[in-house]
Amino acid sequence: MNIEEFDYDLPESLIAQTPLKDRDHSRLLVMDRETGEMKHLHFKDIIEYFRPGDTLVLNDTRVMPARLFGLKEETGAKVEMLMLTQIEGNDWEVLLKPAKRIKVGNKLNFGNGKIIAECIKEMDQGGRIMRLHYEGILQERLDELGEMPLPPYIKERLDDPDRYQTVYAKESGSAAAPTAGLHFTDELLIEIKNKGVNIAFVTLHVGLGTFRPVSVDDVNDHEMHSEYYQMTQETADLLNDTKSKGHRIISVGTTSTRTLETIRRDHDKFVETSGWTNIFIYPGFDFKAIDGQITNFHLPKSTLVMLVSAFSSRENVLNAYKTAVNLEYRFFSFGDAMLII
């Protein structure tokens, strides 16, 4: 299967640069998973597609203000560091810009010494493992010194950083938002609960792979990045009960999907667990966890387009994307949404 099979034409003007004033006023393309039949609504209308007994699964990760600007201690050269994934203790996987002159042993200074980052391992494509030295609590230092790490295709400054967080964001650790969740408001979630729909949470911290394109021609040769996930006993019990009663599990975003499918693959049921997943979902994948998913419109030739294609079909998804382009839907992180069910 060639990467070019997941390409599509997208005018740059359709890449949403700012969020809408009201989260749930974005447009919603509802697509039948089997037939590809489409309907066009607004996100607040999504409640029409939920049934009592369904469980909606949200990723409660919180985006860190993880973009830092500092100086190389030895030379005073300016450097930008994007913190991606906590490896262990104070060791973090990061992206540096520029990176080529940052070698093992070099130190970076942020905020006049409030954070010192020492390079302990070089990786490819600008990646490094850095050991952080700081006083107090890291989250407080990041809140003081860091900026929100918006995706590279967003060129405009975000006036309100909370608009790149879901309203239910809780567990800090992501380098990017689980953007399908950005459409939900507190009020909409209450309406959904009042309809008899369960709300469950998992955590998956979005990391390095979000910022890197697929670099191989043959999809089978792609190595997926690893991301940390966790599921509580409460969520596991609720999901197992949903399945046993014949109700549906609907995931919000590809991150929730990857978490749920990882756990069902590894344990044959939902269990309290945590770990790292590099699950790669592309056409031919056998879904065992979800019955529907909510997702944004993703970048051409990305693993996320492959994931949604696996859940329906490549033909259905690319036809839906072509329709969305023709109808001038908004694309990517601050864009509109799909419900595939």
UniProtKB/Swiss-Prot annotation:
Disulfide bonds, paired cysteine numbers: none
EC number: 2.4.99.17
Keywords, ordered alphabetically: Cytoplasm, Queuosine biosynthesis, S-adenosyl-L-methionine, Transferase
GO MF annotations in UniProt: S-adenosylmethionine:tRNA ribosyltransferase-isomerase activity
Annotated localization: Cytoplasm
GO biological process: queuosine biosynthetic process; tRNA wobble guanine modification
This protein's record includes keyword Kinase: no
Superkingdom as given in the UniProt entry: Bacteria
Chemical reaction(s) catalysed: 7-aminomethyl-7-carbaguanosine(34) in tRNA + S-adenosyl-L-methionine = epoxyqueuosine(34) in tRNA + adenine + L-methionine + 2 H(+)
Pathway, per record: tRNA modification; tRNA-queuosine biosynthesis
Functional note: Transfers and isomerizes the ribose moiety from AdoMet to the 7-aminomethyl group of 7-deazaguanine (preQ1-tRNA) to give epoxyqueuosine (oQ-tRNA).
Family, per entry: Belongs to the QueA family.
Quaternary structure and partners: Monomer.
Protein name from the UniProt record: S-adenosylmethionine:tRNA ribosyltransferase-isomerase
UniProt organism field: Staphylococcus aureus (strain NCTC 8325 / PS 47)
Lineage: Bacteria, Bacillati, Bacillota, Bacilli, Bacillales
